[in-house]
């Protein structure tokens, strides 16, 4: 993060704009809207500045820039068409530890101006860090279309209710659930827009007096195989509403950055062959947090019902009568194959796909004879440590040694690495890779050279 987004309280605080043209006028409008006590310095001014000055809204200082104008300022903007003058203003402000924006020169500025969506008191700021103002503007326009014009009235009304809500609902969780109900109530929003006081009062009383569901719940969310962009919209909504997020080592930092900031985070770092927290204890963590009335998200890599032990966790909750739901995710087989240019099925090469765990329990044995058959694709999860055994068994049961294989490490992430070869090389290839990795075996692997689009690693 190159810039920290902050919202400044400028009401009745001295601010300076150097420049008297159209660009300076646009900046002045923003500062005046924020209630700043504004001084504008330039050699000449467009008529709008004169009109504002005549109305007593700002002070004009006609003449060359004088550094002393900054002495009482909280914030300054250099908005002239003279680069040297803009630089001088910036340096003078820097020497006084005053934040200064330099129009069209973000590297010379100590702060930048974002694109703004104003639904006061709700404000949304969009910034590209000065690298692409057009992109920021396009995003602002898209957000403008999504946010109702009366949203600010709802936010202002919520501020008026805060004291009563705090008295009415004892816990933070109860208050949050009330606010969520209020903000999605279309009737209240429309009543506020129409200034219909009777309807506003009736709807508010109904919302406040409705019994809240004090039971906790658990939502099992599949986070996908790595790329945060593959998280589903519903999954995103759930992690942003959670009181507690229980997650493991397969969840990327990019995804964790999307979690609600004040949610509790419980790390239970699992990996094949080793569990930082035993599965039974994970089950109990989910149960305990839900019994406290909290909304718990169990965030799992891939899809929670495909080698994710999601069923085991939900059985514990079901036996205890805890409400639960499941948000599917893109499983590793689908994500890794797509990002590696390997179609799992193909009319000429594979009419079926088998998803197999390579993390076998002691004494467990797979149906190797059927797995060795042609016209199918095998995908082994957690199979890196068993690669030599997989190679030996498949060849022993008749799979050709030249069968194409691929191992995908950190699939779909920017650090994805893929190596391919033949079945006779599988054990050797596995020694070059690290967990988490996925093994794909089948004729479809031979299409990778033609269909690979994501990387050449």
Curated annotation (Swiss-Prot):
It holds the Pfam family Sirohm_synth_M. NAD(+) binds at residues 22-23, 43-44. Residues 216-457 are annotated as: Uroporphyrinogen-III C-methyltransferase. The modification Phosphoserine is found at residue 128. HAMAP family: Siroheme_synth. NCBIfam families: cobA_cysG_Cterm, cysG_Nterm, PRK06136.1, PRK10637.1. In the N-terminal section; belongs to the precorrin-2 dehydrogenase / sirohydrochlorin ferrochelatase family. In the C-terminal section; belongs to the precorrin methyltransferase family. This is Siroheme synthase.
């Amino acid at each position: 993060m190159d810039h920290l987004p902050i919202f400044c309280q400028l009401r009745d605080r001295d601010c300076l704009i150097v420049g008297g043209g159209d660009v300076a006028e646009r900046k002045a409008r923003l500062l005046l809207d924020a209630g700043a006590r504004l001084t504008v310095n330039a050699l000449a001014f467009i008529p709008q500045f004169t009109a504002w000055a005549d109305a007593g809204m700002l002070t004009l200082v006609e003449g060359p820039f004088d550094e002393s104008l900054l002495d009482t300022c909280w914030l300054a903007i250099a908005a002239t068409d003279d680069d040297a003058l803009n630089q001088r203003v910036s340096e003078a402000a820097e020497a006084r530890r005053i934040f200064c924006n330099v129009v069209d020169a973000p590297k010379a500025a100590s702060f930048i101006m974002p694109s703004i969506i104003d639904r006061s008191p709700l404000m949304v700021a969009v910034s590209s860090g000065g690298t692409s103002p057009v992109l920021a503007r396009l995003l602002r326009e898209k957000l403008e279309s999504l946010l109702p014009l009366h949203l600010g009235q709802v936010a202002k009304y919520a501020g008026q209710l805060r004291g009563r809500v705090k008295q009415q609902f004892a816990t933070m969780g109860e208050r949050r659930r009330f606010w969520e109900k209020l903000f999605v109530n279309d009737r209240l929003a429309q009543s506020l827009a129409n200034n219909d006081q009777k309807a506003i009062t009736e709807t508010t009383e109904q919302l406040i007096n409705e019994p809240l569901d004090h039971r906790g719940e658990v939502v099992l969310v599949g986070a996908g195989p790595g790329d945060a962009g593959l998280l589903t919209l519903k999954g995103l909504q759930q992690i942003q509403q959670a009181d507690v997020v229980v997650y493991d080592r397969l969840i990327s930092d990019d995804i964790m950055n999307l979690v609600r900031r004040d949610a509790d985070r419980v790390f239970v770092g699992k990996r094949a062959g080793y569990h930082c927290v035993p599965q039974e204890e994970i089950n109990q963590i989910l149960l305990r947090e839900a019994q406290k009335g909290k909304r718990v998200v169990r965030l799992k890599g891939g899809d929670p019902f495909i080698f994710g032990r999601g069923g085991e966790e939900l059985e514990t909750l079901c036996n205890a009568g805890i409400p639960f739901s499941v948000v599917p995710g893109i499983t590793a087989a689908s994500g890794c194959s797509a990002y590696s240019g390997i179609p799992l099925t193909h009319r000429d090469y594979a009419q079926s796909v088998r998803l197999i765990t390579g993390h076998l329990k002691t004494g467990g044995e797979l149906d190797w004879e059927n797995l060795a058959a042609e016209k199918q694709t095998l995908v082994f999860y957690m199979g890196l440590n068993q690669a030599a055994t997989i190679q030996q068994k498949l060849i022993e049961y008749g799979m050709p040694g030249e069968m194409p294989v691929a191992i995908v490490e950190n699939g779909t992430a920017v650090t994805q690495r893929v190596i391919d070869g033949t079945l006779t090389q599988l054990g050797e290839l596995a020694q070059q890779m690290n967990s988490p990795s996925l093994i794909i075996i089948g004729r479809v692997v031979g299409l990778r050279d033609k269909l690979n689009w994501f990387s050449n690693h």
